[in-house]
Amino acid sequence: MKKFIVIIVILLTGLSMGIITLSSQKNNQENTNSKNISYESKITDIKFNDKVNIYLFYGKGCPHCEALFTYFESIKSKYSKYYNLYAFEVWYNEDNGKIMDYFLEKFDKKVSSRSVPFLIIGDEVFEGYSSSMNQKIIDTIEEKYKNRDNIKDFSDVLNI
């Protein structure tokens, strides 16, 4: 009977260690992926330089937001020389919500319950996201970069 209990304990211990190892590997994979598509900007990160500023307001867990982050990752190597991307999570962060409210007021937009993603490229607004918007996003980045001297910089956002 003692041998049976010892064998059961050893099997349960081995099974538990295997589950922990698999869980750890999965978490490491998720963390690696999220590092590639996760942005946690602060208002103090915002720079006003020779690039177009892009402000992305998102909600943690929003699938459309995640798809938009993935899209920005896919164009980063070719287009990031044209823009600074600042992303603010607004569902769980009240301070970031105030930043979104600032832009909503500037663009005279009314969105309910922090509708996300809410994207601003230079002085143009995009509400929501689907892959059908991809070319429009690239065209807007290029156009705003070419005309960046004529775009309001919203530097007063730093006073929030």
Regions found by a protein language model. Give the residues of each.
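Positively charged n-region of N-terminal signal peptides that target proteins for export
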Residues: 1-4
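Sec-dependent signal peptide cleavage junction
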Residues: 15-35
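Short active-site neighborhood of thiol/selenol oxidoreductases, capturing the structured segment around
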Residues: 47-60
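Typically the conserved alpha-helix immediately C-terminal to a functionally engaged Cys/Sec
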Residues: 52, 64-79
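C-type cytochrome heme c attachment motif
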Residues: 60-67, 117-118
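Extracytoplasmic/secreted envelope proteins and their assembly/folding machinery
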Residues: 69-76, 97, 101, 134, ...
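Thiol-based oxidoreductase modules, predominantly thioredoxin-like and allied folds used
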Residues: 81-99
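Non-catalytic, surface beta->alpha helical segment in thiol-disulfide oxidoreductase systems
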Residues: 114-158
